[in-house]
């Protein structure tokens, strides 16, 4: 479901570049909003169930590097992030990888609270240039931290989506800020898991 929604969303961006406000484009982008929350949720679930964190992380990092080429080619953006803008310079897979790293950090008993806070800030800076920016990394952290409490997981997920929508509203596009909130459509799908 997430791959189909993502494909519809990305094809819409490629066929109709920019922030088009026609109903077909908006509808396809709204459908696409379910993708990221599903990915966030399953990164956290994968972390819980994996037998080898190292292999899981390496596969995700490799996929992030490979998908960067496809992402920059598809959207006609420079290969090197931050050369034109700070937003959406690489795929969401980069943020997924760093979200996974935050889950591992969160489980560490060797790190003090202030050290974890510094790491979260650093990871947010590292993942800022990706699709869904650092919102994806902190959403994964909160989804993983509240595993076992679906309502709390989804509440925090939507808090972070709302933060992303606010950034869109003030810095990118007001209509597409509202589109981000359609991530809530993923909640019934995730509840059925």
Describe the predicted segments one by one.
Residues 1-193:
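Alpha-helical transmembrane segments and their immediate juxtamembrane cytosolic regions
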């Amino acid at each position: 479901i997430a791959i189909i929604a993502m494909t519809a969303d990305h094809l819409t961006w490629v066929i109709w570049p920019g922030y088009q406000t026609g109903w077909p484009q908006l509808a396809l982008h709204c459908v696409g909003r379910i993708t990221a929350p599903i990915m966030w949720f399953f990164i956290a679930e994968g972390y819980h169930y994996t037998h080898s964190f190292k292999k899981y992380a390496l596969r995700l990092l490799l996929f992030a590097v490979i998908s960067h080429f496809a992402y920059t080619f598809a959207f006609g953006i420079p290969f090197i992030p931050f050369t034109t803008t700070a937003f959406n310079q690489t795929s969401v897979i980069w943020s997924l990888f760093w979200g996974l790293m935050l889950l591992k950090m969160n489980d560490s008993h060797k790190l003090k609270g202030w050290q974890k806070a510094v790491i979260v800030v650093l990871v947010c800076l590292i993942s800022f240039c990706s699709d869904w920016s650092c919102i994806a990394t902190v959403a994964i952290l909160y989804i993983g931290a509240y595993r076992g409490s679906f309502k709390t997981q989804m509440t925090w997920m939507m808090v972070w989506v709302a933060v992303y929508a606010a950034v869109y509203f003030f810095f990118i596009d007001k209509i597409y800020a509202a589109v981000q909130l359609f991530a809530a459509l993923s909640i019934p799908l995730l509840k059925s898991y």
